[in-house]
Amino acid sequence: MGTLTSVAFAAAVNIRFRSFHRENIKTTITTLPKWQKRLCFSSTEDSHRFRIAKCLGNDENSNRDDSIGENGETHKSSVVKTATFEEEDEETSKSSSTTSSSNEFGSDKTSMPSTIDPTYSSFQIDSFKLMELLGPEKVDPADVKLIKDKLFGYSTFWVTKEEPFGDLGEGILFLGNLRGKKEDVFAKLQRKLVEVASDKYNLFMIEEPNSEGPDPRGGARVSFGLLRKEVSEPGPTTLWQYVIALILFLLTIGSSVELGIASQINRLPPEVVKYFTDPNAVEPPDMELLYPFVDAALPLAYGVLGILLFHELGHFLAAVPKKVKLSIPYFIPNITLGSFGAITQFKSILPDRSTKVDISLAGPFAGAALSVSMFAVGLFLSTEPDAANDLVQVPSMLFQGSLLLGLISRATLGYAALHAATVSIHPLVIAGWCGLTTTAFNMLPVGCLDGGRAVQGAFGKNALVTFGLSTYVMLGLRVLGGPLALPWGLYVLICQRTPEKPCLNDVTEVGTWRKALVGIALILVVLTLLPVWDELAEEVGIGLVTTF
């Protein structure tokens, strides 16, 4: 039992603690400002058994003429009332659950207002609706049911679960148990999909995400993803993309010419050198003096551009038999190498991983073949007395930038030629060197570079993650690439970090010889980008090594 006494209440309060309008009270009540009209006060006894709260200016009760107590009587005067009640009053509990929370306080636990602003909650809902409206079109639920009933079954793939599929959950992923050979089941499902839904959807066979174990038939467990064609297939090349590609190509031509000019810097006429180095020189030199200088720089520019175009030609020649569409190349200019290569996108979905490997390797192999030819011919001409007038002077430190190319140059040119401050070489050596370095950078196994695509196709997406992290670490520590590691790493992070999208059949592995080709290519990439350390350079005589 408990006893609570209230003194000089502004309104009579019954055991249910209803609040009453002030017009029913004979005592004089001072009119409160608007900001105080909904101010609530509460007081609690030391026993903490009961709480009384009184709210002034309750709008919901403003039209009430009287207040009804527990016994049904009307109270119109201020009284002092003592209420004695049981701690566990069943009647009070029932009345608390049925009366309005705005004017009754018959429960020990008063409902707390939500801490979330209604405006923010409404904004969240509107944002989700906007994302759904502007996002890619999702698969029709009616089509999902139809495809599930018509395509899948006991003899192909028994569906046990469905999940969202795609970057924004715009597709459906069917999980279950495979009931046949992967390739045969997938081919059968693709034929049925065309019969049921025509060309409306694309079906992907991928490895089951978060699989708890391998498939009983061998290999990874598979699942099938369904996406609308307009969502899963890349869009056509737009006009502004052609404009950007043209601008980048012109800039790449300029950077290649600049590389050729830099290689011929020792051949500048004395008048031109004096004009640019003497602050007192006023009269500019005759521009005709630069014509022979520019003509001598163009062969190197032609060589660099030829390697780039041959690289892209390899991609396109490999894509045509596979009926894969490629975008126009977006060449990336660079003043050190002439170019960082080009960004070439797939404009159609790849059918399988073997196709991804073939197209990805075709470009680097074509570019590397032409680069090796130029490099070899250039080294041979560098030793011929008849080509002495065509040779250019380069710092011997250049040959320390690549372990593989430095050792080949050392074996061809000899100790005396490389163990000096400068080395006389043919411009084709520089063109081949730049082409091989650019090809090696593009074959790094990261993102959607040629090397990343090849590794993803040959060894799977999990292997690409491991290779990619290792590549980023080695670039960050400048283990690979030397002074070009930082700009190349930034370029990859900005433009090429995202892995390629899965193929239609992203489960069937490639053959052993394709894996071997990718492995050999990666070894050559490391040897090309690995600099010659000082101890080895001093021992074999590549450049002049200064030790302290």
Curated annotation (Swiss-Prot):
Q: Name its cellular compartments.
A: Plastid, Chloroplast membrane
User: Which parts of the chain span the membrane according to its record?
Assistant: 242-262, 290-310, 326-346, 361-381, 388-408, 416-436, 474-494, 516-536
**Gene Ontology CC: one annotated term:** chloroplast membrane
Composition bias, Basic and acidic residues: 61-76
**Where, if anywhere, are coiled coils annotated?**
none
Record's note on what induces expression: By ethylene. Down-regulated by dark.
InterPro entries reported for this sequence: EGY1-like, Peptidase_M50
Say which enzyme class the record assigns.
hydrolase
Alphabetic keyword roster:
Chloroplast, Developmental protein, Hydrolase, Membrane, Metalloprotease, Plastid, Protease, Transit peptide, Transmembrane, Transmembrane helix
Q: Which domain of life is it from?
A: Eukaryota
Q: What Pfam families does this protein's entry cite?
A: Peptidase_M50
Entry's EC annotation:
3.4.24.-
A Gene Ontology biological process in which this protein takes part is:
thylakoid membrane organization
Q: What is its main location?
A: plastid
Query: What is its biological role?
Result: Membrane-associated and ATP-independent metalloprotease required for development of both thylakoid grana and well-organized lamellae in chloroplast. Required for the accumulation of chlorophyll and chlorophyll a/b binding (CAB) proteins (from both PS I and PS II) in chloroplast membranes, and for grana formation and normal chloroplast development. Involved in the regulation of nuclear gene expression in response to ammonium stress and interacts with ABA signaling. Carries out beta-casein degradation in an ATP-independent manner in vitro.
Recorded family membership? Belongs to the peptidase M50B family.
In Swiss-Prot or TrEMBL terms, this protein is called Probable zinc metalloprotease EGY1, chloroplastic
Q: What is the lineage of its organism?
A: Eukaryota, Viridiplantae, Streptophyta, Embryophyta, Tracheophyta
